[in-house]
Amino acid sequence: LPEDVVDGLLVQGDGSKQALILEHRRRIDEGECSHLVGLASFSEGLDLPGDYCRHVVIVKLPFAVPDDPVDQAIAEWAEAQGRNPFYEISVPDAALKLVQACGRLIRNERDYGTVTMLDKRIVTQRYGRALIDSLPPFRLDIAPLR
């Protein structure tokens, strides 16, 4: 990465969430380069309106970890009922988390920006359509997979 981009990175773990957000806001207010990089916890409860957030990059679809004992018990219950736990539990849960992550970008009617999804499963797997359909009515551009 170019040095100016690296210098502008604020990475989760390099400080408290609050400290990183305050530094990000300060940099933007002063016209400096700032890129806030975080994991799933940054997709919830984060309010960065206007120029504080113009691009959200989602690296992977937000499916829950499959070895969680509570999720396993719920999945077993659904299977015992003859239902499909992946499509009835996992996909709707991931859709909700995806909407929350995209919601970091658009906080009011004047906000605009770009959401980039890097996980190709959104277009290559059958459940990808359900995830896309759960999102607000964004313009959708799908780049060719390489």
Annotated model-derived regions:
Residues 1-146:
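ASCE RecA-like P-loop NTPase motor cores
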